[in-house]
Amino acid sequence: LGVLMVVGFLGLFLKLWRDNVVNDADREWKKHMGEMLKGNKASMPPVGKYNYGQKLVFWAMAVSLAVLLLSGFLFWRPWFSPFFPIEVQRIGLLLHAVSAVVLIAATIMHVYAVIWVKGTARAMTRGTVTEGWAKANHALWYRDMTKGP
């Protein structure tokens, strides 16, 4: 099951990782993240295609899936576990458990954010957003998408 999760996410990762690199606009947004959590969206600085919180969820999922895959090999019976001492397997189990908790928490945050921010479900399921939504939620990305050649 874990290998299938990684394979399923790999295509998404390869497609989206460049858009999820943290930049200066994200660092500025991060400074005001508390305002967003309080519901004071109007005071948030403009962001690109993804905001810092979205990028944080992306990287939490990517890293935790990678750690789950690698740590899983350490105790995958009967194929790989015989090659590793029990101490290494125990460390692998601990890393595996921590990574699973991180992945589950990131998934819960992701689902919550989809419900919390109106218009996000449409963006995820259809791949499109309205012009007003883009302007209000991702002003820098909107500007990049609407500027002429």
Where are these regions (language model features)?
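Membrane-embedded alpha-helical bundles that constitute the cytochrome b-like, heme-associated redox core
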Residues: 1-149
